Amino acid sequence: MSTSGVLDTINTHLASVTNPTPQVVVRGEPILLNASPTFAYWIQSHSEDFETLGDRSTSLSVTIRCYWRLEQAQQVKEALELEVYNAIVSIKQKLSADALLGGNCQYSICGTADTGYIEQSGITFKIVTIPFQIDVYSEETITP
């Protein structure tokens, strides 16, 4: 079990979403959004759950965020809402189907997806944010 394996597996699952297909998947919060949709994920927090005599088990909170460049036409906005919904369902299905993330964690679960808007470089983007909680047992070895 490893955090790097967790992150690699999340990347693989996000890249394999086909409805909608991301133009790019970014590990880390994107600085510049050139493609739509862009799927990104990053570590939000890391904490110790419990400790034994030989190791520590941890919880990792990952933020998954999808970005769509917003268009002005009403028909495009209506189609976008369906694409946003499909992205939420597809991402949650991919991650739930592999709750152990390829054997790299003990358990994982998606939280409630939120939608909203952000502006970057004068361009408005529709966003979906999905919190993702991961438990990694025996992640840190304690040596006496």
Language model segments and positions:
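Charged, amphipathic alpha-helical segments and their flanking helix caps
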Residues: 1-33, 45-144
